[in-house]
Curated annotation (Swiss-Prot):
Required for proper assembly of pre-ribosomal particles during the biogenesis of the 60S ribosomal subunit. This is AdoMet-dependent rRNA methyltransferase SPB1. Residues 345-390 form a coiled coil. It is an enzyme of class 2 (transferase). The lineage of its organism: Eukaryota, Fungi, Dikarya, Ascomycota, Saccharomycotina. GO terms for molecular function: rRNA (guanosine-2'-O-)-methyltransferase activity; rRNA (uridine-2'-O-)-methyltransferase activity. It catalyses: a ribonucleotide in rRNA + S-adenosyl-L-methionine = a 2'-O-methylribonucleotide in rRNA + S-adenosyl-L-homocysteine + H(+). S-adenosyl-L-methionine binds at G58, W60, D78, D94, D119.
Length: 837
């Protein structure tokens, strides 16, 4: 017979066994506590007092003496004797006895343990159920000893075995510790049923319920509750087979009963779940009555033959049939109850009843308020977690205005809802004669007055369309990079800007709406409300009399910085703006404003009609004044500066612009022709008060289609080709850095060559050789490794010994899988910028 191979004590002689021998530990279990300590925050390094229960042979004590601080107290106890260890106190005792407790107190005196370790297991071999209970009982005794000696926020590490008492022990741990985690370190064998539980943050309760540490209470087996038959009826397809044997006194799997018993039973769900079949007694008079029911169909008779194959729909049909049967048989009729006489309450009882009702209502109100606040806090937490940091105080304050106090205009202004109130409906309506009498206006009777409500609806609709279009643009900009680039190049088309402030007369004629409705807040007598009303009226007037600016321009110039700025002159042109006229207008306005400033500064001047020349004769010019006039001493210099400025900004980027440039350069067109082309059907297009989405859509159709030439297209292509041929910024920077390094190396060599040349002790031949040696270092090319050719070993190369045909240089025989792996490794190394060794 052949010799059998030794199994190494069922696999116990693994790598941790040999590592323990190399490190000098007494058992391989030392690596378990090392791995647990590293995983859970190095608690041994912070422990000055450590108790090791069931410590034999002492490997955990060895690890503790190595990792704990110097002069730490380490105590090891076991029922079997142990060899002594340095810096460790060991004694022999049973941890379940009082002798062990007294000896521990004698060694520790007034100290408390920072960490308690337990890696014990009882003697097994009686029976599986007995062994599992004994192991859990030993763990509970170790916990009892740890609770007596642990410090607050201490740590308890114990070994526990998988059994039906595992969850009970975990529940006990959770009552005594802040954090309980189960782990299985790599040093623990997979075939072993052991699990290590790390309990951190000992609560150290002042009064401890003795039932938590009583094995009879902790491991008590509770009777099973009633079987859930509803799951069988309403989810018959989800059947979980539990192989737990027969019930007490019931040794059959097949059960049947009469269908009348099912009708008369108080718990029909249980009957449907337990029975396999309903039998029918044809001679029973009650069945003869139920047989004539319209629900008693052939399908019903087929269903009661085998209840275990029915589905949810069939069970519902049986329950409906039972309800109809009970109605016919009169089983659901309520028994006649006698009239209950209610004694009238006296005055004291009535008062007490009302007080109880009021208290109950108050409690309900407080409960609702508390629930509302909790919901708001929860929403706020969720909003903060999702990084939705938009302030919501305005909405909350506005929601609480009508709840806690009366309406107040001052409060409305503080909360920021004054604008919304200004746009709301008014109640007091005045006639046209009253408005004309107050404002000294003449109103034509033939004017058709539109309904204010309809106008508000139209305004709201336009606002919604504009908001939706803006959202559409934002979403498109997020998705499409070309659209973002187009917006950045062209920008948004703004309305025409006529200055910082418009003339009052034109504003009154053009922008003042005919409002025939006024507010009913005139009866308010409070000073704060009067002040707020005046502010509201002035704000509305400023909004109605605003200049023709876009929303962005209004937001910019509403800054207090622009309050004292005077309006400038600006001529309205459509396509072509004459730079000379703009420059003249700017020059005139600057000089005029400067003269006015000089007039205000002259306090001793009595003649108000004096010209600007007299002002200059009276007041001496400063250096800054001379700078103002010297900026535009020469019109030619100003024109040249303006031309240079605009020449820098011009970029011919379209075919139309290139065609126009060619025509201007060849003399085919003149400046006068360009001015004439500026007057076309689209030049005076009325875009005022039109929505942005409409203008964007019409923009592509509201322009002149200019002809292009083949030469312009080719010239633009050559220009773009030259631009595309340029390297990217990173490549250009890399080349520049490389060139700079080469220049620096050359400068160093020049300095060294100069030093060598100045050395008088060397001959000219030696100098030339050393300089040539330096130059060779600079011009030396880096050696490149020869490329290895990969040859796939299949077909004619399969099993080939020697060099394959047609392969020169170094080669490597690989199969298909290895080739793919090598390529993948190269891709990974290239991706992470690592050199493969």
């Amino acid at each position: 017979m052949g010799k059998t191979q030794k199994k190494n004590s069922k696999g116990r002689l693994d790598r941790y066994y040999y590592l323990a021998k190399e490190k000098g530990y007494r058992a391989r279990s030392s690596f378990k506590i090392i791995q647990i300590n590293e995983k859970f925050g190095h608690f041994l390094e912070k422990s000055k007092v450590v108790i090791d229960l069931c410590a034999a042979p002492g490997s955990w004590c060895q690890v503790a003496s190595k990792l704990c601080p110097v002069n730490s107290l380490i105590i090891g106890v076991d029922i079997v004797p142990m060899k002594p260890m340095p810096n460790v106190i060991t004694f022999q005792s049973d941890i379940t006895t009082e002798d062990c407790r007294s000896r521990l107190r004698g060694y520790m005196k007034t100290w408390k343990a920072d960490t308690v370790l337990h890696d014990g297991a009882p003697n097994v071999g009686l029976g599986w159920a007995q062994d599992a209970f004994t192991q859990s009982h030993l763990t509970l005794q170790a916990l009892k000893l740890a609770v007596e000696n642990l410090v607050v926020n201490g740590t308890f590490v114990t070994k526990i075995f998988r059994s039906k008492d595992y969850n009970k022990l975990i529940w006990v741990f959770q009552q005594l510790f802040e954090k309980v985690e189960a782990t299985k370190p790599p040093a623990s064998r997979n075939v072993s049923a052991e699990i290590f539980v790390v309990c951190k943050g000992f609560k150290a309760p002042k009064k401890l319920d003795p039932r938590l540490l009583d094995p009879k209470e902790v491991f008590e087996e509770l009777p099973d509750g009633p079987q859930n038959m509803e799951a069988k009826i309403y989810n018959p397809e989800k059947k979980v087979r539990k192989r737990q044997g027969y019930e007490e006194g019931d040794h059959l799997l097949y059960h049947e009963c009469s269908v009348l018993d099912f009708v008369k039973s108080e718990d029909p769900i249980t009957v449907l779940g337990e029975m396999n079949k309903f039998t029918v007694e044809q001679d029973d008079p009650e069945w003869k009555i139920l047989k004539r029911l319209k629900q008693t169909t052939n399908e019903f008779m087929a269903c009661i033959e085998d209840l275990k194959v029915l589905g949810k729909k069939d069970f519902k049909m049986l329950l409906k049939w039972r309800k109809a049967s009970r109605d016919i048989l009169g089983l659901d009729k309520d028994e006649d109850k006698g009239d209950i006489e209610i004694e009238p309450l006296n005055e004291e009882e009535q008062i007490e009843k009302e007080l109880r009702d009021l208290q109950e209502k108050q409690k309900q109100k407080q409960k609702r308020e508390k629930r509302r606040k909790n919901e708001e806090k929860q929403k706020e937490l969720t909003r903060m977690q999702m990084n939705m940091l938009t302030p919501t105080d305005i909405g909350i304050e506005a929601a609480n205005i009508g709840r806690d106090s009366l309406f107040n205009l001052k409060t409305a202004e503080k909360t920021g809802i004054l604008d919304k109130l200004a746009k709301g409906k008014k109640r007091v309506i005045f006639t046209e004669d009253e408005i004309a009498q107050d404002n000294d206006l003449h109103i034509d009777e033939n004017i058709v007055i539109r309904d204010r409500h309809d106008m508000n609806e139209v305004d709201d609709l336009e606002g919604e369309l504009n908001a939706m279009y803006q959202d559409y643009k934002n979403r498109k900009a997020e998705r499409d990079a070309n659209f973002r680039a187009k917006q950045a190049r062209g920008g948004d088309v703004e309305d025409e800007w006529t200055g910082f402030e418009g003339t009052k007369d034109s504003e009154d004629e053009n922008n003042e709406p005919k409002d025939y409705i006024e507010s009913d807040d005139s009866e308010l007598s409070d000073e704060d409300d009067d002040e707020a009303i005046n502010q509201l009226i002035s704000k509305l007037k400023s909004q109605n009399n605003g200049s023709k600016l876009s929303s962005q321009a209004k937001a910019l110039f509403s800054n207090p910085l622009f309050e004292n700025v005077q309006p400038i002159l600006q001529s309205k042109t459509d396509d072509v703006v004459d730079s000379e006229s703009v420059g003249d207008a700017t020059k005139i306005s600057n000089k005029r404003s400067y003269n006015e400033m000089k007039k205000e500064d002259l306090s001793d001047s009595s003649d108000e009609d004096s010209s600007s020349e007299s002002d200059f004769e009276i007041v001496a010019n400063d250096e800054s004044d001379g700078d103002i006039d010297s900026d535009y001493d020469s019109d030619e210099e100003r024109k040249r500066t303006t031309k240079e400025k605009y020449d820098k900004d011009i970029d011919i980027a379209t075919v139309e612009a290139m065609t126009l440039a060619h025509q201007l350069a060849l003399g085919q067109r003149s400046k006068h022709d360009l001015v004439d082309e500026g007057f076309n059907r689209y030049a005076f297009r009325d875009t005022e008060n039109l929505p942005e989405w409409f203008l964007e859509e019409e923009k592509q159709h509201s322009k002149v289609n200019r002809p292009i030439t083949k030469e312009a297209v080719m010239a633009l292509k050559e220009k773009m080709k030259a631009l595309n041929a340029r390297p990217i910024k990173k490549v250009a920077e890399a080349r520049a850095r490389k060139k700079m390094r080469a220049v620096k190396r050359l400068e160093k060599i020049k300095k060294k060559a100069g030093l060598i040349n100045d050395d008088s002790d060397k001959s000219e031949k030696d100098k030339a050789e050393e300089i040539a040696k330096l130059m060779r270092k600079v011009t030396k090319k880096q050696k490149t490794k020869p490329k290895v050719t990969l040859v796939v070993a299949h077909g004619k190369n399969k099993g080939l010994s020697g060099r394959p045909k047609g392969i020169k240089g170094k080669y490597k025989m690989v199969d298909g899988v290895l080739k793919n792996e090598q390529r993948a490794l190269k891709r990974i190394a290239k991706k992470h910028h690592k050199k493969k060794k």
